[in-house]
Curated annotation (Swiss-Prot):
Topology of the protein relative to the lipid bilayer: Single-pass membrane protein
Species, as recorded: Schizosaccharomyces pombe (strain 972 / ATCC 24843)
GO cellular component entries: MIB complex
The name this protein goes by in its record: Uncharacterized J domain-containing protein C63.03
Keyword Transmembrane: yes
UniProt-listed PANTHER family: DNAJ HOMOLOG SUBFAMILY C MEMBER 11
Coiled coil: none
Gene3D superfamilies: DnaJ domain
Membrane-traversing stretches: 445-465
Biological processes per GO annotation: cristae formation
Keyword annotations from UniProtKB, A to Z: Chaperone, Membrane, Transmembrane, Transmembrane helix
């Protein structure tokens, strides 16, 4: 729904969208007296009748709580819909709840069609043979082995896939709540559970969210020269209270696996996440505990402890030691983004100590995607007992309204090994193609794996994508300006007509105010700040429109709404700041005030008095 659709009726009464019922009633009574057809001459009666009907319709909708609720959410089109909520005996609050439920159901259906079904496909490819120089071959006479150069065709024929993994999931809502937060969606998998943890978020608080749901997660993975390993998980998510959410997952195929996880927010700064994984009765369960606390405004410290595979006496002593105990500390630093209420990641650092793996890692968010530059760039480095020193770079950009394409490059130091990954995602679907490029330093591999793709991306961005993006932005801006100009012309004609209708009645009211020494508007001008005398289109005389607001020697203009929403004032065609100047007399003393476009005021005020 266009936002303007749920705004026009408020503009008809000259009110902000958060106007109270008393303000709606007061504005209606004042405007109905101004534009009542019986108070105008015969040549103005038709125009007054049209304006009066608009005001009458606006008041009928906005003064009715149920109609107002529908209009605020669906606009005029919603008023034409039979909502089936007019049951006798229903209170205004019950009607609001009924409408809210219908709105929430509609939103859930829209979200379900977009993100409830998710899938992820990963295919690992080994392309290191592309840069193999020689190959060892057996002598045909059986006199030993020699080497020879590989042909390009032979190199390409040696490229092969290493492994693939396909994972998909979908959710079925089982119950809803208007008060609970939405539990974060983290699918269980048969692999690592490190990504199952996330801090509780308050951004969805107060919205209608699923308080419990059932998720089905299927996964199939296979390595070269090995059997396919399928798995199916059923995961039940519930949120019994705003501070607590829990999940329990069951493996429906052998080997049996049960996973239990909870997220508990102790307060607004501290959370704890315990996770237990049970894989049969022959070994003790594995556990992971995460404790996090917000230390600074944008900084959070997280501690994670994993038991790994362990034994208690003879219980579990025969189990393979695939994942041993570890402890890690992570600091996550966010940063504020202009014109955004949600902070974004700036950098994070992690230190891990364990029996099988120990290391440090640091990631820095170099650039966030913006409207002018849709690229997001991240840099990272890590050093561990398993992979040595690794340096990585990741860049991604939107290639459509819902699609994102990204490239990740990782370089091993000092071996010079290169691995890069191509990633594509659209809504809940994701495809990853990790490519093993070279295992040792090779100039050809570095050129084709680093220099060529980076320069190609920069060249395409600089000489093709960026000019095209700027051209589209310019074209869209011109279209918006033309649309605004057409709308401004229509509103200008309507405002001039309204001033003509009000002028005679307002002048009579001002004459009465003058006779009793009340509030008299001498002059009012709505203009662009610092506009020159040779720019008549950037200012307008609004004396009649402001004087029409005077009631019983008082004038009130609400805040947070543009002055162009006042009856008889049309928008000025400019992106610059606007202001309203009012010169008035009260008790035969002159006053003057200059207001910003969305600044409220109550007249008269001693602060506005002009000192002689």
């Amino acid at each position: 729904m266009d936002e303007a659709d749920s705004w026009e009726l408020y503009l008809a009464l000259g009110l902000p969208k958060d106007a109270t019922s008393d303000q709606i009633k007061e504005s209606y009574y004042r405007l109905s007296r101004l534009f009542h057809p019986d108070r105008h001459t015969a040549d103005q009666k038709a125009a007054a009748e049209e304006k009066f009907q608009i005001i009458q319709h606006a008041y009928e909708v906005l003064s009715d709580p149920s109609k107002k609720e529908i209009y605020d959410n669906f606009g005029e089109q919603g008023l034409k819909t039979d909502w089936n909520v007019g049951f006798p005996g229903k209170s205004a609050e019950e009607l609001k709840n009924k409408i809210r439920e219908q709105i929430q159901e509609r939103d859930i259906h829209e979200i379900d069609s977009l993100v409830q079904s998710r899938s992820e496909t990963t295919i690992v490819v080994n392309m290191t043979p592309l840069f193999a120089r020689n190959i060892r071959v057996q002598n045909a006479l059986g006199l030993g082995a020699g080497t020879r150069m590989l042909t390009p065709y032979e190199r390409f024929s040696l490229i092969q896939w290493v492994s693939f993994q396909i994972k998909s999931s979908f959710s079925i809502p089982t119950s809803f709540s208007n008060d609970l937060k939405k539990p974060s969606f983290n699918s269980f998998s048969s692999g690592s559970f490190d990504d199952e943890f996330s801090a509780p978020s308050d951004e969805d608080e107060g919205n209608h969210k699923t308080s419990s749901r059932l998720s089905i997660v299927t996964e199939a993975s296979m390595r070269q020269n090995s059997k396919l390993q399928p798995s199916i998980f059923a995961v039940y998510h519930s949120q019994p209270s705003p501070n607590l959410s829990s999940e329990i997952g069951f493996s429906l195929l052998r080997p049996g696996l049960i996973t239990v996880k909870s997220v508990y927010a102790i307060n607004n700064q501290t959370f704890i996440v315990p996770l237990i994984q049970i894989s049969g009765l022959k070994r003790p369960p594995q556990a992971t505990v995460v404790i996090g606390r917000q230390i600074t405004r944008f900084g959070t410290l997280t501690a994670r402890w994993k038991t790994g595979v362990w034994s208690l006496g003879s219980w579990g002593i025969a189990s393979p030691r695939g994942a041993n105990s570890s402890f890690s500390l992570t600091w996550q630093q966010m940063k504020a983004i202009p014109n955004s209420l949600v902070p974004q990641l700036s950098w994070n650092a992690e230190v891990t100590a364990g029996l099988m793996y120990s290391g440090i890692a640091y990631n820095y968010n170099l650039k966030n995607a913006t409207e002018d530059s849709p690229y997001q760039i991240k840099l990272g480095t890590s050093m561990s007992t398993v992979g040595g020193l690794q340096v990585s770079g990741d860049t991604s950009r939107k290639v459509g309204r819902y699609s994102t394409f990204g490239v990740n490059i990782s370089v091993g130091v000092p071996t010079g090994s290169i691995t890069f990954s191509l990633n594509w995602s659209r809504l809940g679907q994701k495809i990853s193609l990790p490519i093993m490029w070279c295992s040792v330093f090779d100039r050809s591999a570095v050129f084709w794996g680093l220099v060529f793709p980076i320069t190609s991306i920069l060249g395409v961005e600089q000489f093709f994508l960026r000019p095209r993006r700027l051209s589209n932005q310019k074209r869209l801006r011109l279209l918006r300006l033309q649309k605004l100009k057409d709308s401004q012309e229509r509103k200008k004609v309507s405002a001039i007509r309204a001033v003509k209708l009000m002028k005679e009645i307002v002048e009579k009211k001002q004459k009465l105010e003058m006779e009793k020494g009340g509030l008299v508007i001498e002059y009012a001008e709505y203009r662009v700040v610092n506009c020159g005398a040779n720019e008549p289109d950037l200012k307008q005389d609004v004396t009649i429109s402001i004087a029409a607001l005077v009631e019983n020697s008082r004038l009130a203009i609400p805040s947070s709404v543009s002055k162009s929403s006042i009856i008889g004032i049309y928008p000025l065609f400019s992106d610059n700041e606007k202001e309203l100047e009012i010169v008035y007399t009260f008790h035969q003393q002159r006053h003057r005030v200059v207001l910003r476009d969305k600044q409220g005021v109550f007249l008269p005020s001693r602060e506005h008095k002009i000192l002689s």
